[in-house]
């Protein structure tokens, strides 16, 4: 995994604009992937960012880069707790819920629909998706409620990714790109 791939997939989380990003990471050697994640956690942990493999298959890891403190806050809202309880999450706290999510990812081939709650999707949009409502627009996720706010968020994420990729290419390292928080 390269830092370029990390920035392309996770710039909004590195910038502190969202809780987490999820991306598939091809690898040739499982131990090399885990070593890279350990190194990344040493470098970014002091900024409040962690990377964990949620699922590792033959040649691809599913990596979740996130801000634990923000995940804790996101998942503690009443609407998130209600949605998560529908899927058997009886956990309080981000790390316990993350463990449950990883277990669900390993047990099923498809993505668990509640995964959006771990990626800063609004709970009302996750619920709209689960209820098969007609969506208002599609960007980083399917939007079922506040279309204008979502479009602004999509534009912020896109601009952030563009700026971060440019800064990385100019030689700014990932630690300097990562906002503390």
Where are these regions (language model features)?
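Short, surface-exposed beta-edge/turn micro-motifs
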Residues: 18-20, 59-61, 112-114
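A glycine-rich, hydrophobic loop/mini-helix early in the fold
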Residues: 36-93
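Short linear loop/turn motifs
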Residues: 58-59, 98-101, 130-145
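Short, surface-exposed acidic
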Residues: 90-95, 123, 138-139
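Helix-hairpin-helix/helix-loop-helix acidic hairpins
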Residues: 93-109
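Hydrophobic/aromatic-rich, well-ordered segments within soluble, folded domains that form packed cores
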Residues: 111-137
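Long, compositionally biased
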Residues: 139-181
